[in-house]
Amino acid sequence: MNSGPGKKPDWLKIKLTSGSSFASTKKLLNKHSLHTVCRSAMCPNLHECWSKGTATFLLLGNVCTRSCRFCAVGTERRPAMPDPEETAKIGEAVKAMKLRHAVLTSVNRDDLADGGAAHWVETIRAIREVNPGVSIECLIPDFQGDEQALDSVMRERPEVLNHNIETVPSRYASVRPQASYERSLAVIERAKRQFRLATKSGMMVGMGETPEEVNAALRDLRAHGCDMVTIGQYLQPTATHLPVSRYVTPEEFERYREIALDAGFRHVQSGPFVRSSYHAEAFEPVEEISNS
């Protein structure tokens, strides 16, 4: 029987930082009533990123229609309708924050006919309208495999198209039962093969997977056209969420980084606090990737 991961190790102790940039970022987001995955998903890097004046915008509200057992975002079967002013607010926030690289993500909205794809498109266009030259990274949901919805977002040609597999296939039933490993791989493949976009994905470890399974998942991602990958430690957000199976050591994360680079990934972020959008600007430039 698994007795749990034990005491949280020293390498997982967060150093909180703040300052003027942190305060101004928080004030700006509150002013526009904008959601961020940093806050809604209880990201451990919130203080670091906000102190640097960066944030990942959360589209379509902060309530999800799915109930993945690792995620801190709230869930409902029928959340409130999306705020039609959110798109313009995000565009203005990107301008006010003077971002060079804007990162967008969203909750799953399986209650909407298009999964929220039109809202995604409007947001991308709103950002570009008032922020010429800014690069955009889109961490999209799977839109339940709806090709029309996927294509509408991909046709906007974000500089990075990100979709997370989150975990290895053997853990899907326990970790994200409303998702499909194969469907997630198909999203990445579609972005690369049909739209020639720079592609990115991510996964968490410490949820009961084996190193061999992580290595196999990395090979699967490369085989489906994934250019960039993030690997981070799963941290249980509340007592009702999936328990941590074990704490992966920094040395193991370094081995995963080396394995990913050997597999052919162009950029790799692998470490205990790494998340999908952590140091997202480090994945630039992407021109040579999207044309590969």
UniProtKB/Swiss-Prot annotation:
Main location group: cytoplasm
Residues annotated for [4Fe-4S] cluster 2 binding in this entry: 64, 68, 71
Single GO MF annotation: 4 iron, 4 sulfur cluster binding
Coiled coil: none
Cofactor note: Binds 2 [4Fe-4S] clusters per subunit. One cluster is coordinated with 3 cysteines and an exchangeable S-adenosyl-L-methionine.
Residue ranges occupied by any Radical SAM core domain in the UniProt entry: 50-266
The keyword Cytoplasm is assigned to this record: yes
Documented EC number(s): 2.8.1.8
Cofactor: [4Fe-4S] cluster
Residues bound to [4Fe-4S] cluster 1: 38, 43, 49, 277
SUPFAM superfamilies xrefs: Radical SAM enzymes (SSF102114)
Localization per record: Cytoplasm
HAMAP family on file: Lipoyl_synth
The protein, known as: Lipoyl synthase
Species the sequence originates in: Chlorobaculum parvum (strain DSM 263 / NCIMB 8327) (Chlorobium vibrioforme subsp. thiosulfatophilum)
Encoding gene per record: lipA
